């Protein structure tokens, strides 16, 4: 009788509603059925873990409920985007190997061993009838890494050059840079806040989700005293590998710095936040990539001329002169496409069982295949 290709030894683990511990078995399958149980084990839960699990189990409109419902809503919006892609590309769903979906980061605490990107990839797979690959960051964190940034490996694939050092700067909610050395080595790390604080301030004082074309910031003046107060943040002095997020750089962080500057015009604060983004990026380039021949910007901030102008000036002020700042359009990839392309690439790597992280970037102990597969 032919052997089932899925036959072999499997472990099964189950911790039930009693929350007393986890039961496990090691079982060999033959012809798709358990042929022999090789071992069993039980590991009890400590009282502290049981108490934590019972507390999390309480029903109601709590954080767990809100996260789950938000994840469902996100998956629905992701499905709309996928349908648009199918329509616009005229590619049948059956030809799509996989959807690589990052999810929405709501917590990033690698120092505590976790990062959380909410999403419901099972629901997305059910709606699209296409394999979905998600949860890219957690394996890197499990291997001792920061789980971020992940895009430098992709940047190296598409933007690297043998004869010069290049910097790719992503200006999303958080800024990060990838250093593509002429030698072929790659470094990358988060620099600090970008659109996260700029958008927060624009929403508060303009009633708009972002500062379109940087007009709000252009109407203000950089306040050097406030800028220095903002720069007095320990994260900016940390050595890479490092990553950050809205856990640190959020409205509360900004508001805690502002009381001595209550007389400042709102536009001046916005201009100073632009300067903060530019200076923190420029300082890292000066420290780690002073031989760069060009800086290529992607992400939402690439469409803000005030940030690009400020970054060019900050580089000059940092002693990195004559290095042009331009968008990734110059390399043939529109700034808005870089990150979704990166997660399509990571999905492809997962399908091929190839590593997607760079330990030199994230600090992980070794290369790892990233992502969890949710079959169609």
Swiss-Prot record:
**Enzyme class, spelled out:** transferase
Binding residues for ATP: 16-23
Q: Which GO terms describe its biological process?
A: 1,6-anhydro-N-acetyl-beta-muramic acid catabolic process; amino sugar metabolic process; peptidoglycan turnover
The pathway it acts in is:
Amino-sugar metabolism; 1,6-anhydro-N-acetylmuramate degradation; Cell wall biogenesis; peptidoglycan recycling
Catalysed reactions, as listed in the record: 1,6-anhydro-N-acetyl-beta-muramate + ATP + H2O = N-acetyl-D-muramate 6-phosphate + ADP + H(+)
Q: Which InterPro entries does UniProt cross-reference here?
A: Anhydro_N_Ac-Mur_kinase, ATPase_NBD
Return the EC number.
Answer: 2.7.1.170
The similarity annotation says: Belongs to the anhydro-N-acetylmuramic acid kinase family.
Q: What is this protein called?
A: Anhydro-N-acetylmuramic acid kinase
Q: Which GO terms describe its molecular function?
A: ATP binding; kinase activity; phosphotransferase activity, alcohol group as acceptor
User: Is Transport found in the keyword set?
Assistant: no
The task this protein performs is described as: Catalyzes the specific phosphorylation of 1,6-anhydro-N-acetylmuramic acid (anhMurNAc) with the simultaneous cleavage of the 1,6-anhydro ring, generating MurNAc-6-P. Is required for the utilization of anhMurNAc either imported from the medium or derived from its own cell wall murein, and thus plays a role in cell wall recycling.
Q: Which UniProt keywords apply?
A: ATP-binding, Carbohydrate metabolism, Kinase, Nucleotide-binding, Transferase
Q: Name one Pfam family in it.
A: AnmK
